[in-house]
């Protein structure tokens, strides 16, 4: 039996960065808000303190902060002719399942996406002609501009304690920063993290090649900091336990220690953990949503939570899944090229080289999530001529360390036996002496990369699993080959003792090894309901009181990590709801 609860002004599904931002902003505006999070509450003092957090087996190998694939997963295939099979263990990407979401266990890399992404089709057609874009590449403009988002990027960076060096303030190029970035109103809230040896060596080599290295902006506080909301950060300890871990020092920007505690102190807010939302409910004419149904996973009780506004703020994949399960918006059909929900799923590509320097001591166990140096000469540099190389998109190149832990980090030169005495000797010899140079590359939307509901497999609640159909296309192969050439050229100029050269990802994509937790698309934003699921305010074209906030609204994927625009869009959407929608409920953009 389902228990119907008292109606609230807004219900939030998923409480990570986006849900936390909306919870804080809407409760402060006077709305009664309930947040439903299927994960557990974790706090720094109880769950991420030393020695608890220094457990690679628990947090990295056994995915303690991640979704449990025995209860819910996806089915995976490379193309529509294949049978999709369930992902039985996490690999390629790692969605969080905890209060605070994936922001609890991320590295902190925080970028500003620019009009090169938001106006991607217009800009490429203008520069290279319409025929340059492949017929099956379904990229489109997003319907928003960098100028509109700039104040919200700024707000997120100051909330999340981003450390970095501005490259462009008000149109004036700044020494030491990224000269290709779009103009920002002011400097980062904190100076960059301390450069490590690998980053210093890469910086010198990149400059010799005529490139423009700069410290990677990251939500790892380089010194103690109090953000504008009063949330207090400690300084990064360079402990090496960053990606896949909570932060012992409260130095990593995370919703669980910033916006969420602020919301929880507000009497207008209620958090319910272990609450798995199974469906968004619609009224009789299907033009409004009326709330959600959810199950308490600890005891199996089922509830209906009525609400005036429904906000989908779960991980990107789960937001799309819930839209499909709830029958909101037309499901995408790749053959007919109709429908919008499930359309334009994108991932990222890349290439990397490992360099070995006999006699060097890199101390890779001492690092931060953002202790990298990056070049954007082949990324947001519009002077880089893609036409010569025949691909749409871009990549950034970086060097440094993130998490070099004893179980997972064992760099050895190619040709080393994979086990036994020689392997042991090689891991001991090369652990201290190796560094990495890697590229993160964009993936453009393609007609045949999409989500839909699996016809065979179901989750613990008897609902169809999400089916992901994805593979890299020739565009990504070309991009990856170019990235590998640039990486190898820089690497060879550094004269390593041994070099595992970079190669492009040209084999079919596989879900098995970890690559990145940067899944985008599925309920994309746009200018009209024919091509997109939500408008520029992330409001559903079909049900005006439904908003979905996350990387699922991205119309393609860039080379950058998505959290910067995700956070900015959350503040942007909160602003639109507070100042426009609540005063006059209805579509914020005419269809």
Model-predicted segments: where are they?
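Conserved hydrophobic helix-helix packing surfaces used for dimerization/oligomerization
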Residues: 10-12, 33, 546
């Amino acid at each position: 039996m389902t228990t119907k609860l008292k109606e609230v002004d807004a219900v939030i599904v998923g409480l990570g960065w986006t849900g936390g931002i909306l919870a804080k902003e809407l409760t402060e505006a006077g709305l009664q808000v309930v947040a439903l999070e299927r994960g557990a509450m974790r706090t720094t003092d109880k769950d991420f303190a030393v020695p608890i957090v220094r457990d690679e087996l628990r947090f990295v190998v056994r995915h303690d902060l991640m979704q449990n694939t025995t209860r819910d997963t996806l089915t995976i295939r490379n193309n529509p002719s294949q049978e999709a099979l369930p992902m039985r263990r996490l690999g390629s990407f790692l969605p969080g399942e905890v209060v605070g979401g994936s922001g609890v266990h991320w590295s902190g890399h925080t970028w500003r996406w620019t009009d090169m992404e938001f106006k991607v089709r217009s800009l490429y057609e203008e520069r290279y002609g319409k025929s340059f874009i492949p017929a099956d590449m379904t990229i489109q403009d997003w319907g928003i501009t960098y100028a509109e988002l700039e104040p919200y990027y700024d707000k997120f960076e100051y909330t999340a304690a981003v450390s970095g060096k501005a490259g462009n303030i008000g149109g004036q190029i700044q020494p030491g920063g990224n000269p290709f970035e779009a103009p920002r109103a002011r400097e980062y809230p904190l100076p960059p993290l301390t450069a490590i040896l690998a980053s210093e060596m890469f910086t010198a080599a990149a400059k010799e090649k005529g490139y423009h290295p700069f410290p990677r902006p990251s939500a790892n506080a380089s010194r103690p900091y109090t953000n504008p909301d009063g949330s207090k950060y400690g300084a990064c300890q360079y402990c090496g336990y960053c990606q896949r871990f909570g932060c012992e020092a409260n130095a990593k920007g995370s919703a669980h220690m910033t916006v969420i505690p602020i919301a929880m102190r507000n009497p207008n807010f209620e958090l319910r953990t272990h609450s798995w939302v199974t469906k968004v409910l619609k009224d009789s004419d299907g033009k409004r949503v009326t709330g959600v149904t959810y199950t308490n996973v600890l005891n199996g009780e089922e509830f209906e939570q009525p609400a005036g506004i429904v906000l989908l703020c779960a991980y990107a994949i789960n937001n799309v899944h819930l839209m499909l399960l709830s029958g909101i918006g037309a499901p995408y059909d790749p053959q007919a090229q109709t429908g919008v929900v499930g359309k334009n799923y994108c991932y990222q590509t890349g290439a990397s080289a490992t360099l070995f320097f006999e006699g060097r001591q890199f101390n890779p166990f001492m690092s931060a999530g953002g202790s990298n140096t990056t070049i954007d000469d082949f990324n947001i540099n519009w002077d880089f001529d893609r036409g010569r190389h025949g691909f749409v998109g871009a990549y950034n190149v970086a060097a440094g360390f993130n998490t070099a832990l004893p179980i997972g980090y064992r760099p050895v030169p190619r040709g080393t036996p994979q086990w036994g005495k020689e392997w042991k000797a090689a891991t001991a010899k090369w652990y201290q002496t190796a560094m990495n140079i890697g590229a993160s590359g964009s993936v453009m939307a393609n007609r045949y990369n999409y989500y839909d509901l699996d016809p065979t497999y179901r989750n613990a609640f008897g609902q169809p699993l999400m089916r992901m159909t994805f593979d890299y296309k020739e565009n990504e192969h070309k991009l990856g080959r170019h990235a590998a050439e640039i990486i190898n050229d820089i690497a060879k100029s550094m004269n390593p003792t041994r070099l595992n050269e970079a190669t492009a990802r040209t084999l079919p994509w596989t879900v098995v090894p970890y690559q990145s937790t940067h899944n985008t698309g599925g309920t994309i934003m746009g200018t009209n309901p024919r091509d997109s699921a939500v408008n520029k305010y992330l409001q559903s074209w079909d049900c005006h009181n439904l908003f979905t906030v996350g990387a699922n609204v991205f119309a393609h994927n860039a080379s950058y990590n998505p959290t910067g625009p995700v956070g900015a869009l959350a503040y942007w959407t909160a602003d639109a709801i507070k100042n426009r929608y609540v005063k006059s409920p209805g579509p914020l953009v005419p269809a």
